[in-house]
């Protein structure tokens, strides 16, 4: 399926010079969204994932349905101050700023096979921070899956030690 036809490009958002790839139009089409989730779930199953991990917020709308499809757990990664129990944290840079992510200390068990999911790979900062926390907790990142890769930004280089999969790439 040509998923790009379901992505809306928004110029100069959230700041000037950014060509934002809006996945909400993909999600609004039930067939396209379902097929995208199914393709990403096949990848996660091939990686023998025990759990799916996704950063907020769009990582939730990608990762939760994959976890449901595979009948495995989903672990949310949230911005600082959003998780109620004891957490570890990692700072990261993104396409248009900097922030801090957290994950519950008890959310990943040593040796668990983890597939990280998100809507988009740009600089790789968000996913690098997420992977670092998963590994700090003893998990093994066996794959990382995206709806979209912005290849021209080069985030893949930052994540070269991991197996990456994306449904769409923008050069």
Swiss-Prot record:
Transmembrane segments: none annotated. Pathway: Purine metabolism; AMP biosynthesis via salvage pathway; AMP from adenine: step 1/1. The keyword Transcription regulation does not apply. Keywords: Cytoplasm, Glycosyltransferase, Purine salvage, Transferase. GO terms for molecular function: adenine binding; adenine phosphoribosyltransferase activity; AMP binding. It is found in: Cytoplasm. One of its GO terms (cellular component) is cytoplasm. Belongs to the purine/pyrimidine phosphoribosyltransferase family. Catalyzes a salvage reaction resulting in the formation of AMP, that is energically less costly than de novo synthesis. This is Adenine phosphoribosyltransferase. The lineage of its organism: Bacteria, Bacillati, Bacillota, Bacilli, Bacillales.
